[in-house]
From Swiss-Prot:
HAMAP family: McH. This is Methenyltetrahydromethanopterin cyclohydrolase. Keywords: Cytoplasm, Hydrolase, Methanogenesis, One-carbon metabolism. Catalyzes the reversible interconversion of 5-formyl-H(4)MPT to methenyl-H(4)MPT(+). Disulfide bonds: none annotated. The lineage of its organism: Archaea, Methanobacteriati, Methanobacteriota, Stenosarchaea group, Methanomicrobia. CDD domains: MCH (cd00545).
């Protein structure tokens, strides 16, 4: 069985050993837990963003960058691919762990979830569970975790705290922008899972999304990074699943009730209460599917350059 934690550990060790080259900072706490700051007190960068995103995917995804443009505006794009979509996206990358300890709060993702089974139902659905003495977690937070936080995470993972590694980046940072946009494929896989589709039938996946400019405000940064996928995420899925025809029209974001406005505006209208937002909005803009059993192709959704540029501040 593939170990997402063992694969991610190799990437983490590279970040830690060459922290200066990556514009990040390595810290080892008194209890032996290891942390790489990718944007809290350091600039980070594209190389760090690639490593952070690949760690989130449990070492089962590949990340690249390119320059593209939306209408007349040039901007960077992320490209993500994986040959293990269910495990890498749902079993690792999904931000399925709310980390709380004392006054500390962070959204947790990455392969450590596969040890702590956060949430357990996800791993039952995809039929995956990791076995590893080491754990690697990715934390989306403005602050680095202390020893108490790392102790709690290690306990939930069932490992010794000195074998726990964490990468940390704020939403409002370059690495933060990169890693959230790097979830473009995950949003498609997650949406299909929520619709009741067996995501283990997806054999390969690839996606791209624009990387938005970093906002000074964390809530606005959350808006732009979500909009990158909601309004301009383009995904290609390869699968053996003739029954995909029953799910097609519900995949893209333009089928949700909140579609058509930048996410920050929707969030503000909902009094910044996530529970008032139609969760079907968290989907890619456009998806193509190659169904191998019958050799058919499908295309749903479309990008929305105007809302994307408005969200990013160019309109």
């Amino acid at each position: 069985m593939i170990s997402v934690n063992e694969l991610a550990l190799e990437i983490f060790d590279n970040l830690a050993n060459y922290s200066e080259d990556f514009n990040v900072a390595y810290h080892e706490l008194d209890n032996g837990a290891k942390i790489v700051d990718c944007g809290v007190s350091v600039p980070g960068g594209y190389a760090a963003g690639r490593a952070f995103t690949e760690i989130c995917m449990g070492g089962l995804g590949e990340v690249n960058f390119r320059m593209g443009q939306i209408k007349h505006v040039p901007m960077p794009f992320i490209e993500v691919s994986t040959d293990y979509p269910a495990i890498s996206c749902l079993g690792a990358q999904k931000a399925g762990w709310t980390v709380k300890a004392g006054n500390y709060f962070a959204m947790g993702s990455g392969p450590a979830r596969a040890l702590a089974l956060k949430p357990k139902h996800t791993y039952e659905v995809i039929g995956y569970e990791d076995e590893s003495d080491d754990a690697v977690i990715a934390l989306e937070s403005d602050h680095l975790p202390n020893g108490e936080v790392m102790e709690k995470i290690a306990k939930d993972c069932g490992i010794d705290v000195e074998n726990l590694c964490a990468v940390v980046a704020p939403t409002a940072s370059l690495v933060g922008s990169i890693q959230v946009c790097g979830r473009c494929v995950e949003t498609a896989v997650y949406k299909l899972n929520e619709l009741g589709f067996d995501t283990r039938k997806i054999t390969a996946a690839m996606g791209t999304a624009p990387i938005p400019p970093v906002k000074a405000d964390a809530t606005k940064a959350m808006g732009t990074t979500n909009d990158a996928t909601i309004y301009h995420g383009q995904i290609s899925l390869t699968m053996k699943a003739p029954d995909i025809v029953d799910f097609l029209e519900k995949i893209p974001s333009n089928k949700s009730k909140g579609y058509g406005k930048p996410f920050y505006e929707i969030f503000k209208e909902a009094n910044f209460d996530f529970y008032q937002i139609d969760t079907s909005l968290f989907s890619p803009a456009e998806v193509t599917i190659n169904e191998l059993t019958e050799g058919k192709v499908y295309h749903v959704g479309e990008v929305n350059p105007d809302v994307t540029l408005k969200s990013f501040g160019y309109l």
